[in-house]
Amino acid sequence: MSEPASISAGIADRYATAIFEIAAESNALDNLETSINDLAASLADSEDLRTLITSPLVSREEQAAAISAVADKMGLVDVLRNSLALMAAKRRLFVVPALIDALRARIAEARGEVTAEVVSAKALTKTQSEKLAKTLAERVGKKVTINATVDASIIGGLVVKVGSKMIDSSIRSKLNSLQNAMKEVG
């Protein structure tokens, strides 16, 4: 991990810990999860919102006013709204994507769930996704949520990451292995 990325992850982790603990104490984890999913969707959909949280050209005051308006409009839970306001005042809104990931991980852990990052050459059908989740759940002993992405460059097969474990059954990796074996022989 690069130094700026690890600094961002550290900042996001501290905010995530505080937000999670406050939400857990007030039994508001479901509301927090809804709010972070809404915020993540807004970040994915809005170039203006991404620019707002990352641009050094936007002043603290403008960031604070804009993020407050966005939080109010979206109806985010108070603990997240207040944290975003504090982050804007300290010019730390750039860590919001990492904060969302950290909060999702904490909520899933509290529920005994784990998220599997799955990369496939074509989009998985609902049936395939459910079957994969069931198979992975049997292997890891927890409820598994699939976060699927499509990458045509893997040609076929799957790349599955659950926690620190990775299973790469993609055709690309098999071709690379074959290529390396041929280099050793010839």
Curated annotation (Swiss-Prot):
It comes from the Bacteria. NCBIfam families: ATP_synt_delta, PRK05758.2-2, PRK05758.3-2. Belongs to the ATPase delta chain family. F-type ATPases have 2 components, F(1) - the catalytic core - and F(0) - the membrane proton channel. F(1) has five subunits: alpha(3), beta(3), gamma(1), delta(1), epsilon(1). F(0) has three main subunits: a(1), b(2) and c(10-14). The alpha and beta chains form an alternating ring which encloses part of the gamma chain. F(1) is attached to F(0) by a central stalk formed by the gamma and epsilon chains, while a peripheral stalk is formed by the delta and b chains. GO terms for molecular function: proton-transporting ATP synthase activity, rotational mechanism. The keyword Membrane applies. One of its GO terms (cellular component) is plasma membrane. F(1)F(0) ATP synthase produces ATP from ADP in the presence of a proton or sodium gradient. F-type ATPases consist of two structural domains, F(1) containing the extramembraneous catalytic core and F(0) containing the membrane proton channel, linked together by a central stalk and a peripheral stalk. During catalysis, ATP synthesis in the catalytic domain of F(1) is coupled via a rotary mechanism of the central stalk subunits to proton translocation. This protein is part of the stalk that links CF(0) to CF(1). It either transmits conformational changes from CF(0) to CF(1) or is implicated in proton conduction. This is ATP synthase subunit delta. It is found in: Cell inner membrane. Keywords: ATP synthesis, Cell inner membrane, Cell membrane, CF(1), Hydrogen ion transport, Ion transport, Membrane, Transport. The gene is atpH. The keyword Membrane applies. It is a peripheral membrane protein. Pfam families: OSCP.
